[in-house]
């Protein structure tokens, strides 16, 4: 009713204050309304209500009389009154309200009744009445002894109330009391279909979760409700403990399979990390187009299934899963966006914008350190584009501007430029394999591995090229070839590659660095597979090393390899933690914490986060004081012995909090607050790790509050905090071209112009911000942030754990570890194909994703959208939906490569 309507004749009765209090719907006259405040409630009732009240009282009295023949009509009338009182949702129905005072009397009458139909009938009415009384679950008690008639006839509110009581009652019964659970189950079987039919799917799920009978869902779900139910179940997964979370996923998966929604089922099987199930779903689907779509999803997730050759379209499916076309599809996107022109590092640094009084800061020195930075930047910016201006034309000139290990990283950056282009890339790298410089050769070997990252090839070129160098006399050559194999076969768990690498760890010629890199590479190849050989070899290597060797900074990679092998495996690490008990401190705590956090990566496990916070709050004082005395003697020894201090495992704990919490929004928000406290009050080792944790929790998602925090700590007094903060800024904005971040980094470059180490970090961050000219992402989550790619997490962890000792590893000689990020690089694009896999440009709406869990109807899933034509880029937290009715996507989540089908019902 519009505002002015109040002065006109009352068309529609507006609820008066008295009605709000007393629940009457009649509109009393003005005089009555004035007096309503001071009169007693009894007298507020209108004529009609008074009549109703008297009638109900008479019915109750009639039940108390001796004449049993009157019971039936009285009960029928009571029931009619209760049911016919259609009421607003906000107030209690009138008959129930007037019957409340007689509740006790009705119960007495019920007790005195002779058993039979009338008694059951009375129980029904008391059950409904009990809903308004806060009693001891009497609603349920009387329902069970009642006449068992249709639940629906009493309305939704009653069903809801009953469901709540069933859940409470169930939890109080022991498993032993099976008999008493039976009637409850019968009741549940009535409630579920009712809820399903009345848009209350999530209430049905809640009830079944409470009584741990989720499997009952499957048979009551119909075509219209399944999507909502599964969305609700999967969104609850983060909030329930083991093993219920996998039960929910398996239930949703069963529902999807019931309705032949194979892509959705596959996604859940990947969440469960159950490869047999993945294969089963893939092979049981008989529709080739859907199979191709699933192959795209598996390729994106880094999973390869060995199909039998007689499968229809075997070659196509294998090719899609192997990501063979990734490079050509990516370049098609680049051409579409018109960004093929190679960039040089100066385009990124924008030195001309720095207002120095003495010319640009870049022009002063051509130092090896800055050239190394430029090699990385050049690789990051032109990643996967296949051409650049420094290396692809005449690389030797550039390579010799670097020295020693710098040459290794510079040569390897060629692999990043040629990323995913196995056939074309290897020929360009080949000439460097014959260089006279070991460093360049080693870099070229690493480049071969990088090119093959995430792409499978029948001929296994990486294995063929690199296997000869794994036990080479020169440790430099070993490094490039081993790390290269790790990147090329990450996530494949290939036995032949592992048997080649594992012996290197125990080889007498291997330096600690080589042993560490080998453990890393094996961890990446066997990521999340609990491979027994990898576990035993790494453990054996740790046991064999002396205490001094374990103090070497590269020793940290051994437990990291162990952790990666058990990534996301939870309980499965108990045996390893027990085996590590024999190692001496401080290495033991470091290794334990690292393996522990890897096992719970992305799980959002609150209890683990609490344990880690305890570790963070420990203090190590006594050692500091002794150190002061020994400082002078130790100065020279100190260079190599980084993790020797007691607090090293605290840094890992901080990273671990981010690693565990990054899986779900609420956990990540809480972790953010914690990091704020740690930065202000933590020990130095803690503070150094916090920027890295911030980077991990928000990879490729430049949120302003995180950028501001990092920007503040990029001027910190502790140089390692500032190095890590600057690098973290690059990680947070990786591949976004974020203008605000770019400006911040340019200011930092000026501020640190005289400090080569900080400047090196600023350059790295600038390169990352413009990763792949803004088309790639490092975020390990995909498919609407539901799936965590283990290979990507392995790559990120490799880099971040190395940054815990930034001075000796990244700023020392092992900057090649930065290429671990290659494992996490993925194009953040949406490309649409027709059923023949030809590119099909269609218009799509791209906007911020909206959470629609548990909402009624068909709510909008995106907000603030713009319409583009595919191929398009998707930023963090964005979602796409088709803007035309003409096509239907084979998978509901539009991300990566999506196959579209003609809509049969579309009329031109």
Swiss-Prot record:
Q: Where is this region: Required for interaction with UBLCP1?
A: 708-903
- Which residues are recorded with the post-translational modification Phosphothreonine? 24
UniProt-recorded name of the protein: 26S proteasome non-ATPase regulatory subunit 2
Specify the taxonomic lineage: Eukaryota, Metazoa, Chordata, Craniata, Vertebrata
**Which gene is annotated as encoding this protein in its UniProt record?**
PSMD2
GO biological process terms, alphabetically, are: proteasome-mediated ubiquitin-dependent protein catabolic process; regulation of protein catabolic process
Positions of the PC repeats?
409-442, 443-479, 480-514, 517-551, 560-589, 692-723, 742-757
Family annotation (SUPFAM superfamilies): ARM repeat
The organism encoding this protein is Pongo abelii (Sumatran orangutan)
Q: Which GO terms describe its molecular function?
A: enzyme regulator activity
Phosphoserine (modified residue): where? 16, 29, 147, 361, 363
Subunit architecture: Component of the 19S proteasome regulatory particle complex. The 26S proteasome consists of a 20S core particle (CP) and two 19S regulatory subunits (RP). The regulatory particle is made of a lid composed of 9 subunits, a base containing 6 ATPases and few additional components including PSMD2. Interacts with RPGRIP1L. Interacts with CRY1 in a KDM8-dependent manner.
């Amino acid at each position: 009713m519009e505002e002015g309507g109040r002065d006109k004749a009352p068309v529609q009765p507006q609820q008066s204050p008295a009605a709000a209090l007393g629940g009457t719907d009649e509109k009393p006259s003005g005089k009555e309304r004035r007096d309503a405040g001071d009169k007693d409630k009894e007298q507020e009732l209108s004529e009609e209500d008074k009549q109703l009240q008297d009638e109900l009282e008479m019915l109750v009295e009639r039940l108390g009389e001796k004449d049993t023949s009157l019971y039936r009509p009285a009960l029928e009338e009571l029931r009619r009154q209760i049911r016919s009182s259609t009421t607003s949702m906000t107030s209690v129905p009138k008959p129930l309200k007037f019957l409340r005072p007689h509740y006790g009397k009705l119960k007495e009458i019920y007790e005195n009744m002779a058993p039979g139909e009338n008694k059951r009938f009375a129980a029904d009415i008391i059950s409904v009445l009990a809903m308004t009384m806060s009693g001891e679950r009497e609603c349920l008690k009387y329902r069970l002894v009642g006449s068992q008639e249709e639940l629906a006839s009493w309305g939704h509110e009653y069903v809801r109330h009953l469901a709540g009581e069933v859940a409470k009652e169930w939890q109080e019964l022991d498993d032993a009391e099976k008999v008493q659970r039976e009637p409850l189950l019968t009741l549940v079987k009535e409630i579920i279909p009712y809820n399903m039919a009345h848009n209350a799917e999530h209430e049905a799920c809640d009830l079944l979760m409470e009584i741990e009978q989720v499997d009952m869902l499957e048979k009551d779900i119909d075509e219209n409700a399944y999507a909502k139910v599964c969305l609700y179940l999967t969104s609850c997964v983060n909030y329930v403990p083991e093993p219920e979370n996998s039960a929910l996923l398996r239930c949703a998966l069963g529902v999807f399979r019931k309705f032949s929604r194979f892509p959705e089922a596959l996604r859940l099987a990947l969440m469960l990390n159950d490869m047999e199930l993945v294969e089963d779903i893939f092979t049981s689907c008989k529709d080739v187009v859907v199979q191709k779509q699933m192959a795209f999803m598996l390729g994106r997730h880094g999973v390869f299934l060995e199909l039998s050759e007689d499968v229809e379209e075997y070659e196509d499916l294998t090719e899609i899963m192997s990501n063979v076309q990734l490079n050509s599809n990516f370049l098609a996107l680049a051409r579409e966006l018109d960004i093929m022109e190679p960039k040089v590092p100066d385009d990124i640094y924008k030195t001309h914008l720095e207002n120095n009084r003495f010319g640009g800061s870049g022009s002063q020195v051509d130092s090896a350190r800055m050239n190394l930075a430029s090699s990385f930047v050049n690789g990051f910016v032109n990643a996967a584009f296949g051409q650049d201006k420094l290396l692809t034309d005449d690389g030797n000139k550039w390579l010799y501007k670097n020295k020693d290990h710098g040459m290794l990283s510079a040569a390897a950056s060629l692999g990043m430029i040629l990323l995913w282009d196995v056939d074309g890339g290897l020929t360009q790298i080949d000439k460097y394999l014959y260089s006279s410089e070991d460093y360049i050769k080693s870099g070229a070997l690493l480049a071969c591995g990088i090119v093959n990252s995430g792409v499978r090839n029948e001929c296994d070129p990486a294995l063929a090229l690199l296997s000869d160098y794994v036990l080479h006399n020169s440790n430099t050559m070993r490094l490039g070839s081993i790390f290269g194999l790790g990147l090329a076969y990450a996530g494949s768990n290939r036995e032949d590659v592992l048997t080649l690498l594992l012996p290197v760890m125990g080889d007498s010629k291997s330096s600690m660095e080589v042993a560490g890199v080998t453990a890393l590479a094996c961890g990446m190849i066997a990521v999340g597979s609990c491979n027994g050989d990898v576990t035993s070899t790494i453990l054996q290597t740790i046991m064999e090393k002396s205490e001094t060797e374990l103090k070497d900074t590269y020793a940290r990679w051994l437990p990291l390899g162990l952790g990666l092998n058990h990534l996301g495996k939870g309980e499965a690490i108990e045996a390893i933690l027990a085996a590590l008990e024999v190692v001496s401190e401080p290495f033991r705590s470091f290794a334990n914490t690292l393996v522990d956090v890897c096992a719970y990566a992305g799980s959002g496990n609150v209890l683990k986060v609490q344990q880690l916070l305890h570790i963070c709050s420990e203090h190590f004082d006594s050692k500091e004081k002794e150190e002061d005395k020994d400082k002078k003697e130790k100065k020279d020894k100190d260079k190599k012995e980084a993790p020797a201090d007691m607090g090293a495992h605290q840094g890992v704990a901080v990273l671990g909090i981010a690693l565990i919490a990054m899986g779900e929004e609420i956990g990540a928000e809480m972790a953010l607050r914690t990091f704020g406290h740690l930065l202000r009050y933590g020990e130095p080792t803690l503070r150094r790790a916090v920027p890295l944790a911030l980077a991990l929790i928000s990879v490729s998602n430049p949120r302003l509050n995180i950028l501001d925090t990092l920007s503040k700590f990029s001027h910190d007094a502790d140089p390692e905090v500032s190095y890590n903060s600057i690098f973290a800024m690059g990680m947070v904005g990786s591949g976004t071209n974020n203008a605000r971040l770019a400006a911040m980094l340019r200011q930092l470059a000026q501020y640190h112009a005289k400090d080569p180490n900080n400047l090196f970090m600023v350059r790295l961050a600038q390169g990352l911000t413009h990763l792949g000219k803004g088309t790639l992402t490092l975020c390990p989550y995909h498919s609407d942030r539901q799936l965590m790619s283990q290979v990507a997490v392995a790559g990120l962890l490799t880099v971040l754990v190395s940054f815990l000792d930034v001075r000796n590893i990244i700023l020392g000689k092992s900057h090649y570890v930065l290429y671990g990020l290659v494992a996490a690089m993925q194009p953040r694009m949406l490309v649409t194909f027709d059923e023949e896999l030809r590119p099909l440009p269609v218009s799509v709406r791209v906007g911020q994703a909206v959470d629609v869990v548990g909402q009624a109807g068909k709510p909008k899933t995106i907000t603030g959208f713009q319409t583009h034509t595919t191929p398009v880029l998707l930023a963090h937290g964005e979602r796409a939906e088709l803007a035309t009715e003409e096509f239907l996507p084979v998978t509901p989540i539009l991300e990566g490569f999506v196959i579209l089908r003609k809509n049969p019902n579309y009329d031109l």
